[in-house]
Amino acid sequence: MKQHTLAEAIAHTGVGLHSGVSTHVRILPADAGSGRYFVRVDLPDSPIIPAQVAAVSQTVLSTQLGKGEAGVRTVEHLLAALAGMGVDNARIEIDGSEVPLLDGSAQEWVKSIAEVGLVTQAVTDNTVSWDIPEPIWIHQDDAFVAAIPASETRFSYGIDFDLPAIGNQWYSWPLTTESDTSFAKEVAPARTFGLLHQIEYLQKSGLIKGGSLDNALVCGPDGWVNPPLRFANEPVRHKILDLVGDLSLLGYFPRAHFLAYKASHNLHIQLAQRILALSN
């Protein structure tokens, strides 16, 4: 079995979506079999936080990882970029508690990964690709996530908003041998989005302090506040990005059709936990 890591280090600096605080992230090559993991270089002893399902500590409007007192929030876009581009092993050094939002998508991470390229690593690994043995279904009201046995790994998502500019959207993306190219073109550029009527409430709740019209799409009853969109269905493509990032915490993607509708980070992580339990 072969794995991949970065050929060289990459770095970005920017503000976090919820904290509004600027942080610097440096992603370095890592040894075969080490996986993807964060290092809080701003804290004493530089604690390591593995990008694993067991490390999830919170899922309110983003996915947060933690180990002991150390945590890293809003990890999903960066992890989606690494997984989507085939980076199995990466040391992610960060000098704060939240990953920079950058332009609201994974595009800048993906461009940096593509610029430096990957190195192939030979590894003896007991964790091989496996098939989901039976359907998994988790729902909350009319929202759901599912993993269905399939001949390929595929991610499909549906959303439904009572705003004409969004409405009902579906999108499906397959994981293939050319996935790094298709991910970079079809999924990574899709930006996070918010609803105009929710912004004031979220800000009063201490959230989205770093959100702006430069790093998030905003939709109101009269349409998009800050067009143009990169895709006609950019919102649902971004949900695929979130799903890929959250399920990347498994370390690898089982062969299955992952399906979600009106889901959340919480439901994504519940699905990952169920898959992990089945694999054990």
Curated annotation (Swiss-Prot):
Annotated active site residues, numbered on this chain, are 265 (proton donor)
Residues the entry annotates as binding Zn(2+)? 77, 238, 242
The record's annotation in InterPro entries points to: Ribosomal_Su5_D2-typ_SF, UDP-acyl_GlcNac_deAcase, UDP-acyl_GlcNac_deAcase_C, UDP-acyl_N-AcGlcN_deAcase_N
Q: Give the E.C. number(s).
A: 3.5.1.108
GO biological process annotations for this chain's record?
lipid A biosynthetic process
This protein's pathway reads: Glycolipid biosynthesis; lipid IV(A) biosynthesis; lipid IV(A) from (3R)-3-hydroxytetradecanoyl-[acyl-carrier-protein] and UDP-N-acetyl-alpha-D-glucosamine: step 2/6
Q: Which UniProt keywords apply?
A: Hydrolase, Lipid A biosynthesis, Lipid biosynthesis, Lipid metabolism, Metal-binding, Zinc
What is the organism of origin for this protein?
Trichormus variabilis (strain ATCC 29413 / PCC 7937)
Single annotated GO MF: UDP-3-O-acyl-N-acetylglucosamine deacetylase activity
Q: Does the keyword Hydrolase apply?
A: yes
Q: What is this protein called?
A: UDP-3-O-acyl-N-acetylglucosamine deacetylase
